[in-house]
Curated annotation (Swiss-Prot):
The keyword RNA-binding does not apply. Belongs to the protein kinase superfamily. Tyr protein kinase family. BUD32 subfamily. GO terms for cellular component: cytosol. It catalyses: L-seryl-[protein] + ATP = O-phospho-L-seryl-[protein] + ADP + H(+); L-threonyl-[protein] + ATP = O-phospho-L-threonyl-[protein] + ADP + H(+). It is an enzyme of class 2 (transferase). Its EC number is 2.7.11.1. ATP binds at K12. Its main location: cytoplasm. Signal peptide: none annotated. It holds the Pfam family RIO1. It comes from Archaeoglobus fulgidus (strain ATCC 49558 / DSM 4304 / JCM 9628 / NBRC 100126 / VC-16). This is Probable serine/threonine-protein kinase BUD32 homolog. It comes from the Archaea. It is found in: Cytoplasm.
Length: 195
């Protein structure tokens, strides 16, 4: 068994399942904290199932109990270890499916994607939410672009492959343009703060 402790949850990886339990926050009022953890856990499970119905490979949710989700374990390789233009193109296709279903993943990075049996599985929907607006979709895409830039020398080719897949699957050109605008905003802030 492997145990990972993140800012929001403890994740136990067992032989066939993954058990994700949201951690209580001591700084919150106890009743409020419990309510938030229950609501967020239920919402995450609902979003995982909605993503799966939209045609995006995700772990199957097996059980939801209070602040804990039990889901299928996906065996495969982290996308960060097998990244290629084809893989990034497929990530773009799946991101478009999420967005067309009104789902914002919130953390599309190679660490939260698993390649298994030639399919890209999206995992860790802890920051996900439902929204149909261009801005959060643009942020979703921007997060992926930034993760590519931080991890891969050929990030521009990987970004372009993602865009190809995203648009081919019916993703909006406006979302891609918004992701580019968000990047420019960041550059402007950097120049102003340095300057």
């Amino acid at each position: 068994m492997k145990v990972y402790l993140g800012g929001e949850a403890e994740v136990k990886i067992l032989e066939n399942v993954v058990v994700k339990t949201r951690i209580p926050k001591r700084y919150r009022i106890k009743e409020l904290d419990r309510e938030l953890r229950l609501r967020r856990t239920k919402m995450e499970a609902k979003i995982i199932s909605a993503a799966r119905r939209a045609g995006v490979p995700t772990p199957i949710v097996l059980d939801v109990e209070e602040d804990t989700i039990v889901m299928e374990r996906i065996y495969g390789e982290a996308v960060k270890d097998v990244m290629s233009k084809d893989v990034s193109r497929e990530v773009g296709r799946m991101a478009a499916k999420l967005h067309r279903a009104g789902i914002i993943h919130g953390d599309i990075t190679p660490m939260n994607l698993i390649l298994s049996n030639s399919r890209i599985y999206f995992v860790d929907f802890g920051l996900a939410f439902f929204d149909n607006k261009v801005e959060p979709m643009g942020v979703d895409v921007h997060v992926y672009f930034e993760s590519l830039k931080a991890s891969f020398e050929n990030w521009e080719r990987l970004r372009d492959a993602f865009i190809e897949g995203y648009l081919a699957e019916g993703g909006s050109e406006e979302v891609i343009e918004r992701a580019k605008e968000i990047e420019e905003r960041g550059r402007y802030v950097e120049r102003v703060s340095m300057g």
